[in-house]
Amino acid sequence: AVPTTVHCDHLIQAATGAAADLVAAEETNKEVYDFLRSAAMKYGMGFWKPGSGIIHQVVYENYACPGTMMVGTDSHTPNAGGMGTIAIGVGGADAVDVMTNQPFMTKMPKLVGIKLTGKLSGWTSAKDVILRVATMLTVKGGTGKIVEYFGEGARNMSATSKGTITNMGAEIGATTSTFGYDDMMDPYLRATDRGPIADLCKQYAEQLRSDASVEADPGKYYDEVHEIDLNTLEPHIVGPHTPDLGRTVSAMSAEVDEKGYPEKLSAALIGSCTNSSYEDMTRSVSLVRQAKAAGIKAQTSLLVTPGSETIYQTIKRDGILQEFEDAGATVLANACGPCIGQWKRDDMKKGDKNSILTSYNRNFAKRNDGNPETLGFISSPELVVAMAFGGSMKFNPLTDSLKDKDGNDFKFQPPAGEVLPPNGYTPQDAGYEVPTMSGEVVISPTSERLSFLEPFAKQDPAKDYQDLPVLFKAKGKCTTDHISQAGPWLKFRGHLDNISNNMFLGATNAFHPETGSGNNPVTGEENQELNKIARNLRDQGLGWVAFADENVGEGSSREHAAMEPRHMGCRAFVANSYARIFEANLKKQAVLPFTFADKADYDK
């Protein structure tokens, strides 16, 4: 079978800090962790225990390498593309196929080439490259495409910077994003104790990167070609509520006034699988040092998420962790945390309009803290830290000044950091458990969080697809977050029937004014939750259909966004277009994904 690992990164809620939060998670989620560990041990899967890190950072440090291919059940799996891996995010059913030596199939993708010229410097980072790409191509511009970065600017960029870019290829809907092998990957492989692999890559370097003719005439080899000059690229901020609404930091102040965004920055958060490398942390802490020397304190809460136990132990050893804490930052557990909605936020009431700035990858409404009025903006960790000291969405650290302890003007100097730790990564226990190929997998029959999957009832094409009632019509975005919310619902991911109670809770229904609600098309009962209506129809032996507009199922690869509708009686979706993973997941669950022949029919 294909080598497989299990990672526990979604269920640790950020509340008070890493140590206490991890203890609370292990107590609260014990039966889930025990189940995952026992399944991994019995069936030969490597197990990365809770607190070991976010899957993509752990994979980058241990598995990602040039010339390999992998699939992962998370949309940000293409993070590994920064190391020259073809890494594709898939749903669970597709992953099971691969795990059991069945073929993985996807639509033949088109190829997009993005030529990077120049070199990153000053305030501009790899995050600004992908934020610029998202702004250019939009959240559906990469659908059905593989994006390859090439050129001088790609070759002189650090390996971890490359991972930041390919990670957020998920935000443009790309099948995957990747870089060809170059000399910047070699030191990272060796620093992460993979010298033999580094030697092999050097030996086969010519086979692991494009021929010179591709760079000389990219239009001959790619279906689309775009170019970004890193010498002139400005730092970007995207949001709110979508990762493709971008502008330069210099344009942000005017837009705050124009759009009426809350100016005060209510929270600043750095880390996540997108930006938690040693380079990210050292560049960010360089700004903390400048502020400390000037006697300037952060004007908002600052939360720091190390991506893995390796990163955590290394920045702790090097004193970086202490510098963040001395500046008032809260260091969170090595997990997804607020990025996936696992944030016990007490400083803001639901319904209070506020602005937060993160170095994360996704910023849909309600995603981070469950508050629909929280406006989530995304930028580089360097910009997030600097703006935390400014305390305002209008503060531009490239040009604006603050007052130091003596009342004099203080202006941040550009951040500086180390690509790799000078003293190496710490050799501490990273949290990996070798499978024993023994034991039993046990699920309590009374568990509210775990249940064995049962086969769905067989459908009769002659009668089960006739005269289907319409459950709802999505208005605006209909991401996987809208279909199956994360946050507190993540604890039910192992129990299909219970988690189905969140189906469409976040979706806006064109037929009803209240989010997640509608009217029963059969009984006529009004103002009910859509999941309750669906359950009622299913229990009467009736299927139903849902309608949506463009790029339905954008965002997370969570398979529950397809499993829940199937479990609750959905026979088909009809939409103008689909995100790749969601469309594949629907097909795997035998829910038909139809597309309007005429897009205007959606509005009829």
Which positions does each model-derived feature cover?
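Structured alpha-helical segments in the cores of large, soluble enzyme domains
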Residues: V32-A40, A93-T106, A126-K140, I165-T166, ...
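Accessory "access/gating" subregions that flank catalytic or transport cores
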Residues: V23-E27, R37, M41, F47-K49, ...
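Long, structured ligand/cofactor-binding scaffold of large enzymes
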Residues: A1-P109, F492-A546, N551
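Cytosolic catalytic domains that perform sulfur/thiol-centered chemistry
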Residues: G246, S286, G319-L321, D326-G328, ...
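Mobile "lid/hinge" segments at catalytic clefts and subdomain interfaces of large enzymes
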Residues: G67-L200, A335, Q342-G431, K587-K588
